[in-house]
Amino acid sequence: SEKTGCTILGKAEFLNPGGSVKDRTALGIIRAAQASGELQPGGRIVEGTAGNTGIGLTLLANAMGYTSTVVMPLTQSKEKIDTLELLGADLRLVGATSYSDPNHYTHTAEKLAKKFAQREEHGAIWARQFDNLANMDIHCRTTGEEIWAQTEGKVDGFICAAGTGGTIAGVSVALKEHNPGIAIGLADPAGAALYEYVRSGELTPSEGSSIMEGIGINHITDNFAHAQVDVAFRISDEEALPYIFDLLKHEGLCLG
């Protein structure tokens, strides 16, 4: 990096079949539910998602003999809605509300999963990606270990944003087991509360808002509770977007 003088490495999770890091989360959740017996052959997987986890779950459901129901805010991008419809998900679009609202997409998914479990022959599960520790576990066992191996242990820091907190929790645990001195950084968008939580322990949303979808939360998920974060950065859209387009124009990388 000419700007920083550092070597900056990116992990190309967009090369996963569903196009994002959430394919790992989806696989981890399904495998854990299979192992526990909660997910029966031919069963239904229900999840509330901003899109990417729903895409991963639907692809895996198709390949593994399950069906998927995806609950998503209708404010999410048309591209994600179109993709889920193309993949054959049972897509339920709901209004965008705060997490405290009983009609929030996550709570709607939970209620739907209970209904399906009662009436469908092969049952149903709620994936509950925010608080299901199978999320962070697969990132600890795969994503974090891959970063350590692929850098040959020559990594000083890792930084990512948090939606469910599964990636940053799992990767931070894995890397710090190898080297406790590795710095873990959180990039938090405007309007989210984790930046202030890391700095002061207060769960206070920052000023402003962001166009980023599925990133930035105002409560501590069970996954994020395990994240070993050393430093947090508040990133505005005005700061992030020029870098996104610079990477596209000069590096040939479309990152969002």
Predicted regions located by residue number:
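PLP-dependent amino-acid enzyme catalytic core
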Residues: 1-256
